[in-house]
């Protein structure tokens, strides 16, 4: 009898030590995720400013180009203001020359320089590289963008911004002619068009991440064309 009681106690203690297996009583209604899935990184070719610096060590100075909006500047406030003023709820303002005249005249004094752009430009200028800015914006009647960029990033040898929007093109992507014109080796940008323009020009395109609260939606797919993506580049 005593042995039977002991066996019963052992069985009860063993059962208590084994965690209960949870059962899914209702089917999920949304995709969701779990802790293990969240730890799985996408197969993206990440790169850092420090890695780029080491890679370029000992090499002759090169020409590099940068897109502006969401690449070097967080300029969404300007575009949000323009949309509210010229075409609330629509994107027609992007085809309105009055908007481009206004935004390019000086709105970027309220745009926020991205830290990743500061770090990249400092690294390239320390090497003696030439910096160019190539944007998909349409030119306004006054260029207030060039001086803002020169001051924000302390550009030593500033070149006028290349406004590619609205130009007649012989290429598929509007930034390609600017990249070719300035004999660029590396082009940095946040959009698919930046990466595809670099490919079309036959140069290296490196993606910077767009801030999650950018007015430029939908968000592009990082590494979607096999390009390198800079880490910590959304700000």
Functional labels for PLM-detected ranges:
Residues 71, 134-136:
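Ser/Thr-glycine-rich phosphate-binding loops at phosphate-binding pockets of nucleotides
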Residues 62-64, 131, 185:
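Generic beta-sheet signal
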């Amino acid at each position: 009898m005593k042995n039977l009681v002991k066996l019963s106690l052992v069985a009860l203690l063993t059962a208590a030590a084994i965690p209960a297996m949870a059962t899914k009583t209702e089917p999920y209604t949304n995709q969701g995720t779990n802790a293990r899935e969240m730890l799985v990184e996408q197969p993206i070719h990440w790169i850092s400013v420090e890695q780029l610096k080491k890679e370029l060590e000992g090499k002759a100075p090169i020409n590099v180009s940068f897109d502006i909006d969401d690449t070097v500047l967080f300029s969404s406030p300007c575009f949000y203001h323009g949309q509210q003023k010229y075409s609330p709820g629509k994107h027609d303002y992007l085809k309105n020359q009055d908007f481009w005249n206004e935004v390019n005249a000086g709105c970027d004094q309220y745009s926020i320089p991205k830290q990743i752009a500061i770090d990249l430009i400092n690294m390239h200028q320390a090497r003696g590289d030439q910096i160019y800015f190539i944007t998909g914006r349409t030119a306004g009647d006054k260029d207030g963008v060039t001086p803002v960029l020169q001051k924000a990033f302390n550009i030593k040898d500033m070149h006028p911004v290349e406004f590619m929007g609205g130009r007649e093109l012989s290429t598929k992507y509007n930034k390609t002619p600017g990249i070719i014109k300035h004999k660029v080796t590396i082009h940095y940008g946040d959009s698919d068009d930046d990466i595809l323009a670099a490919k079309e020009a036959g140069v290296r395109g490196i993606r910077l991440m767009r801030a999650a609260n950018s007015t430029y939606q939908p968000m592009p797919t990082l590494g979607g064309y096999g390009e390198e993506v800079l880490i910590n580049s959304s700000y």
